[in-house]
Amino acid sequence: MVGPSPAGTVPSHAQSSLPSLPAHLQSDTHLTAHLASRFHVGLPTARLSSQALISLNTYTSSSKGPDGGKEGSAMGEAEDLARRAFTRLGARGENQAIVFLGESGAGKTTLRAHVLSSFLSFSSTPLSSKLSYASFIFDTLTTTKSLTTLTASKAGLFLELQYDGSSSVNPTLIGGKIIDHRLERSRIASVPTGERSFHVLYYLLAGTSAAEKSHLGFDNSIHVSTNAGKLSSASIGHKRWRYLGHPTQLKVGINDAEGFQHFKTALRKLEFPRSEIAEICQILAVILHIGQLDFASGQATLTSAEESGGYSHEGGETVTVVKNKDVLSSVAAFLGLGVDELENSFSYRTKTIHRERVTVMLDPKGARQNADELARTIYSLLVAYILENVNQRICAAEDSVANTVSIVDFPGFSQACSTGSTLDQLLSNAATESLYNFCLQSFFDRKADMLEREEVVVPATSYFDNTDAVRGLLKHGNGLLSILDDQTRRGRTEAQFAESLKKRFENKNPAIVVGSSGSTHGTGYVSQQARSAFTVKHFAGEVDYSISGLLEENGEVISGDLMNLMKSTRSDFVRELFGQEALQTVTHPKEKTAIMQAQVSSKPLRMPSMARRKASPASRLTFDAPTAEEPEDNESYGGSTAKSSGRRKSAMSMTGMQGAAGQFLSSLEIVNKCLSSPSLNPYFIFCLKPNDRRIANQFDSKCVRAQVQTFGIAEISQRLRNADFSVFLPFEEFLGLAEVGNVVVGSDKEKSEVVLDEKRWPGNEARVGSTGVFLSERCWADLAKVGERVVPVYHADGSDEGGDGLLHPRTAGYGDSKVRLLNPADQSLGNFIYGDESKQGYFGSRDIDGRSDTGGSGLNSGDMFHNLETREQMLEKGNEKKMEEVDEVPVSGSRKRWMAIVWLLTFYIPDFAIRLFGRMKRKDVRTAWREKFAINLIIWFSCAVAIFFIVAFPGLVCPTQHVYSAAELESHNGKNGHDSYIAIRGVVFDLDKFMPRHYPDIVPQSSLKKYAGMDATGLFPVQVSALCQGKDGSIDPTVLLDYTPTNISGSATTISTGDLNAKYHDFRYYTNDSRPDWFAEQMKELRATYLKGYIGYTPQYISTLAKKSQNIGSIDGKVYDLTTYISGGRRVAAPTGKEVPANVDREFMDPLVVSLFQDLPGQDLSKHWEQLQIDAGMRDRMQMCLDNLFFVGKVDTRNSAQCQFARYFILAISILICAVVIFKFAAALQFGKKNVPENLDKFIICQVPAYTEDEESLRRAMDSMARMQYDDKRKLLVVICDGMIIGQGNDRPTPRIVLDILGVPESVDPEPLSFESLGEGMKQHNMGKIYSGLYEVQGHIVPFLVVVKVGKPSEVSRPGNRGKRDSQMVLMRFLNRVHYNLPMSPMELEMYHQIRNIIGVNPTFYEFILQVDADTVVAPDSGTRFVASCLADTRIIGICGETGLTNAKHSAVTMIQVYEYFISHNLIKAFESLFGSVTCLPGCFTMYRIRSAETAKPLFVSKEVVEAYSEIRVDTLHMKNLLHLGEDRYLTTLLLKHHPSFKTKFLFAAKAWTIAPESFSVFLSQRRRWINSTVHNLIELIPLQQLCGFCCFSMRFIVFVDLLSTCIQPVSLAYIIYLIVWLARDSSTIPWTSFVLIAAIYGLQALIFIFRRKWEMIGWMIVYLLAMPIFSVALPFYSFWHMDDFSWGNTRVITGEKGRKVVISDEGKFDPASIPKKRWEEYQAELWEAQTSRDDRSEVSGFSYGTKSYHPAQSEYGFPGARPMSQFDLPRYGSRMSLAPSEMMSRHMDMEMEDLSHLPSDDAILAEIREILRTADLMTVTKKSIKQELERRFGVNLDAKRPYINSATEAVLSGAL
């Protein structure tokens, strides 16, 4: 085969074997040209002898050769190779491997499918189809569309076909195994531009029915849409899915919908239950939905008990929230979780930093990364779950497998990192490097060794050897991946990692360069970016890898939060996903149930069958290979056996979990070991791309030549020309095959040489060695007559060759081949994954019928979820908690009475309505809503009553009268800006409005104006007969009634009847122009349009007129004057020319009526009128006459007693309020010099609770406390860190920030000790660490004690965090137990020890405690002033100062608070301080008296206060508002309640500055808390009997007024608006008293800041007044309505059996006995016994309670403070610490020798010594350096172990150990 073919017989391109080309054509260029010539005639393949195949991707069909058949096609060649391998498998019993090499897009996946289908077609078992389905599922889950191909593999595949050895010729397929290596997880959340994520996600989106989409939540318009229209299932391609790349990627020529049906079918064929398939689809939907979650920063305005921190936190800390709650609820439903807990889990992440669990509060970007991590984890676990289940269904028992065929296909070489994951790129390239190295070994080294042993000499061939790169990357122990893993495990930094790489590889390995030299900036300096990178010279080119983020990525840590969250899932499937072996967990060493973190294994779950076998049959050897070193944890590969996985975990306990690189490395080693096995025969398929642009049938010589060079094809071809040996046969076997017998005489070697001479095989294909014969595969086949053997090919339907057989791809396309699932009638089938016209592939035509899918319609066509729970049901199930009864509670009488009132007020609202519309599933939450609603009703009623009293009450008591006295009428004369009014017959009209409309308009307005303010009755004579019907129904028209004005003092100025203008209005009968109804019509019109009121006559004035002989009286409030009538003012007159009729009756009024006015003038005649003996008709007629002729006005009652009462009642209330304001003002004016107190000798504790504040805030607060002008020796700074939490914007946990400020090094790590906390259930057990020392700042040296709440080991999320109240309780409970000499918890005993023995002060000495928030800065003299005031008045139990704002001008929100802060302190608190009862001592700046000065009786820490304040069961609305909203106010309430004889005071001279909320949402939340807690606390105070004062001057009355004013705050603004509107409508009556009161309130406030010279407050006051609507209306109403907005926790009270009230919780039941307690004396005695130490020398008791082990760092002299302890003048503490350092050291050594329980075991030390020596430079390493390194690793002093360390080191070095 070496020689060239005879010229002219066949064209050059017909030669398929490259080694057969002439020697001068063996260069890269010539071989490329030869490949091109074949490519252009439709022959895209070539061979490297029988061992390798070269295939060029045509980007068209891979199954059509030049003549249209498969001959010459890639598929044909693949089938041929498979047939040869299968033959060899049967004939020689060798394991076979087909290894694919090539770049992404070269067609490896397609050819792999052809090879697999060929192998499966050789077997007739039903297993063949199962294996094809399994392969399809693997591809569906792990392939994607990249820039270079539609089917890019993104996971390494080791596909194993298992055969038994019963038949020597045609082995039987008995099983298979899919071993996946390292899925590219990063692609899930980071889809590169122009590429897709994994195909299955697109299948799901496209292939589900409308009903299924609805169930999965795909039909919601929740996703960002690029088109404005509504999203329908048809427009699904236009939705923007974050995890699916650009919307254009949804349509790329892949039939996704069909792919989904095939995916479901494949799962069904592999016996996955329908319900499980539906669950799988739900989980895939979850992944898509997680991508859609939108995060934003918000405030945790829902109050929870765990909140902590200062004023700026009170409105709710900044948290990350999910904006699209509907998407979140879909995710929660499918995962079986509660919506709130899932949302909460995104906003934080728990990490382990320096062996401490820390919760990091995440911003929206961090939450997005957290969500991405969740998506990656779920997808990885789902893939692992599906593949493991597939393997369970296809894998044969290991001991029955005789031989295997392995198909190895790893992703192609990656020059750039497309998904942003350096780790994925590095591991993928490392695998490619390893496989290529194996290829080179197979062709070169492996054969060379054996040829040398057999004394066969062949010419050497030079080739590019990539061993340096392989060794540099993959060497066990000190290869790059091993170092990466080791550095990750040890928690090294990136800089340390870079340094390690430099030490290892610089000038030692040419393939790896650390800190690429090329990246300089012209200055000669290497850039930071270049320094943090390394370059690997791969066989396919150099690649730069960034170190940035690599260590963290390699850890691939799944936080414990996620694991614990998934523990609570209600979904069995999700529980199963997170319970599989693919998920490795790390548990806490002390609490095995607590999962610290987890990791999705980067190792496959299964091992190849060959790797599990201890030895191979010797007789079947081919070429010997250097045996691969057995990896240490070979057996525990992926935790395949329970025993081994357990072993691995125990090994990890010391070193931590193996990283991705370490796992991948060990799995690669196993692959390499299997492939390098002597009993395995490898084949290689080199897949090449003809061009880089995916253009069909175009050959780019440059592109192909580069690939030919990369893979060293020319060198391999040359090597095969020299030595193409594939089989080695010992002489006996060779001769047996050659059937030589005894014909030839001689030795076996001579006989063999004779046979070779006869065969005339070329020398490079057949050679005789010293013990056997080397043959090429062709020669062996010829010899063994393999061609005579028939390899059967089976078809799925049993049809002939022409039919479409199972996995027998005839017309499949490249990149689109392999796939067809349904019958061949559909020409477009198979495009679902590979595009193009393919027709055949994974599945045979008959395999897809419905024979095994009985009732399969639900799966394939309808709704696969119809038998599952709905999303709503799942969500409800996920929100439920597992509860257990933990306690029984009595219900108080007051509670029962209150609930009766609540139900009375809310009975009409049915419970189901609250459940349905309010979405309140829990009964206690619904009850709280009812309470809230009842309280709101009461408040609204109070407001309504207040409004009623202000507005409606005066009107009811004294109805408004529109009457004008004579003087008032006269004042409306149109002069000096007054209106113009005029009166006619007792009715007042608006002359101003009338004048412009006066007819005729010739009369000038000035003439009319002179009548203003006058009675114009005289101008309008009346026709009596038209206005009155008389006694009998008619009056003669000639009868006239004269009008006589009443000119008496007090009556209106009247116009004479002789006025010039009177004649124009005279239309009486006797005039020539008679219009009897004119006056009535005019009056009607005037009343309708211009009426202003009536002339008013007071009862007194009517009496006065009567005395002056006026016949005047009132009936029903109307005043009638009959004087003129009675005095004879009646006459008759007829028109000119007519006579007055005789006997005209001028007496038209009934005598009885007249007599009333004659006999009873000046009186109210209403009763007499009613009693008149006249008929109804007469009464009506007389009433008409009175109204029309004698009416002069109405009775004016404005000065009556009832009206006076109404007026002065409101005034009295106003004056009372004003008096309170004046009192407050007087209280605020506390002038006098600010005397600077003298030095004081009282011991004080300065307490700062820290939560998630930043370093600047903490440093400011602590420094201000330390720098207070108070004797440093007598103050103790106590910082209580509430949980291991990294706040947003912080780079370290808060405790670490605090310790760094105080100067405590990280090496100091005390033991966490138990103590009781405030929490639900088991959360009552908490653990804390105690640190103490000295803090030096600006010349002050202050002792400090830091309490760090770290939580129990089982706490994963927010470990230790229990809230601000709990932080206060830590110190309160400790001091309480100190003063009452009660048993203490371990942590409290440690606190006692640290304070007494380390700091040197007995804890009972401390008399005062100053509580300051972490965002508050105190003035230097404030502490001294507080103590001085408390000494001056020993009855003071609590005292607060004035708090100002440090961020006054930061935002509009802070600006409106400045004045309010000033006034609330200087008015309200100062006023309350007068009574000695400040009702709210703010927690941000208050000093409390710990014990009384005289009797030492505990006050602040008395039993009653501590017990009440440590209430754990906070389950009612009232208790929630007291303890979760306003714990500071409630603490004050408790002090007033339990110590009524003591005072709480305000001291304006003591100053502090805090931070006010800057955003409106936080401000709103903070004020909601304050207002609601105020209401509930004042309700608590009102019943107290002991509040000082008497009657209205009592504090109780003030409390009631305060409560009322809080409730009816909105009314005050409403009243001001009412006054303004009143003024706008009617400025004539100004409510002066109201304005005087308002002016007094604000005027007095202004005086305060004027007297205080706070001139800037004038501006702030204006800002405040503009914000009045917010403070007076918006805040109260918002607060009252949101009174029940809490995070309710999971503990609740329910009605149990027999009506008992029982508490249930999901936190478990707390057993107080789980925390051991001892009195200090007992504890000290135990220490004394243990150490034989004298009691007065108890400093030595540096034993922690938990372990009795000594902590050297905690000794008086050794504790690292912010300055060296030796400079500290100990004696001035008056302490007993006089122990000499030398004695201390010797005692220290003695103690260590006595108790070594905390030291590591000898085995652990030995393991670490081996590890150190394995990587150490033996030329420089010393025993001392080894001991120091061990101490650093274990974190303890190992002096006691020095002899063992020295001996063990020597033993390891000498090989004895």
From Swiss-Prot:
Name of the featured protein: Chitin synthase Y
Compartments where found: Cell membrane; Cell septum; Cell tip
GO cellular component: cell septum; cell tip; myosin complex; plasma membrane
Topology term for the membrane: Multi-pass membrane protein
Taxonomic lineage: Eukaryota, Fungi, Dikarya, Ascomycota, Pezizomycotina
Gene: chsY
An annotated GO BP: fungal-type cell wall organization
Catalytic reaction equation(s): [(1->4)-N-acetyl-beta-D-glucosaminyl](n) + UDP-N-acetyl-alpha-D-glucosamine = [(1->4)-N-acetyl-beta-D-glucosaminyl](n+1) + UDP + H(+)
Start and end residues of each stretch annotated as Disordered: 1-22, 601-653
Up-regulation conditions: Expression is induced in YPAD liquid condition but not in the solid phase condition.
Role, per record: Polymerizes chitin, a structural polymer of the cell wall and septum, by transferring the sugar moiety of UDP-GlcNAc to the non-reducing end of the growing chitin polymer. Specifically involved in hyphal elongation and new cell wall formation.
Annotated transmembrane regions: 898-918, 937-957, 1209-1229, 1603-1623, 1630-1650, 1657-1677
InterPro entries: Chitin_synth, Cyt_B5-like_heme/steroid-bd, Cyt_B5-like_heme/steroid_sf, DEK_C, Kinesin_motor_dom_sf, Myosin_head_motor_dom-like, MYSc_Myo17, Nucleotide-diphossugar_trans
Domain DEK-C residue range list: 1799-1854
Record region (Actin-binding): 668-692
Similarity section: In the N-terminal section; belongs to the TRAFAC class myosin-kinesin ATPase superfamily. Myosin family.
PROSITE patterns associated with the record: CYTOCHROME_B5_2, DEK_C, MYOSIN_MOTOR
EC number: 2.4.1.16
CDD domains: MYSc_Myo17
Domain comment (free text): The N-terminal myosin motor-like domain (MMD) does not seem to have motor activity but is indispensable for polarized cell wall synthesis via binding to actin that ensures the proper localization to the hyphal tips and septation sites near actin structures.
Entry-listed glycosylation sites: 634, 1047, 1072, 1572
Uppermost EC category: transferase
Domain Myosin motor per the UniProt entry, residue ranges: 1-788
Residues holding ATP: 102-109
